[in-house]
Swiss-Prot record:
It comes from Latilactobacillus sakei subsp. sakei (strain 23K). GO terms for cellular component: ribonucleoprotein complex; ribosome. The gene is rpsK. Located on the platform of the 30S subunit, it bridges several disparate RNA helices of the 16S rRNA. Forms part of the Shine-Dalgarno cleft in the 70S ribosome. This is Small ribosomal subunit protein uS11. PANTHER family: 40S RIBOSOMAL PROTEIN S14/30S RIBOSOMAL PROTEIN S11.
């Protein structure tokens, strides 16, 4: 078995992709931002947890903003200029992530809500009593 330290590391290849899709998955606990090419191959990704936010701080709009900013900058290194945004989930970081992607310099051409809606599927979790 090859040692992790001695294993040859793959170099990141700079792809020239003009347009892409930003998938924002916003849950109650975290926000994940993945930027793909039009075929769905990942170009860049980031999440609130991967940036060092822990616990309840991951679910804040600020954490979502930082995650979107990091993914946007990484995608721009690959030559990306315009993106469509697909938002999924009920979390608090949805709008903050979209605004942050626009602020990095990426042109947002469309915003879609792709939150899955059950056709009376499984029973939802019980209501919280705080």
């Amino acid at each position: 078995m090859a040692n992790k330290k001695n294993a040859p590391r793959k170099r990141r290849v700079k792809k020239n992709i003009e347009a892409g899709v930003a998938h924002i998955h916003s849950t109650f606990n975290n926000t994940l931002v993945m930027i793909t090419d039009p075929n769905g191959n990942a170009v860049a990704w980031s999440s609130a947890g991967s940036l060092g936010f822990k616990g309840s701080r991951k679910s804040t709009p600020f954490a979502a903003q930082m995650a979107a900013e990091a993914a946007g900058k990484e995608a721009m290194e690959h030559g990306m200029k315009s993106i469509e945004v697909a938002v999924k989930g009920p979390g608090s970081g949805r709008e903050a992530a979209i605004r942050s992607l626009q602020a990095t310099g990426l042109e947002v051409t469309a915003i879609r809500d792709v939150t899955p809606v059950p056709h009376n599927g499984s029973r939802p979790p019980k209501r919280r009593r705080v």
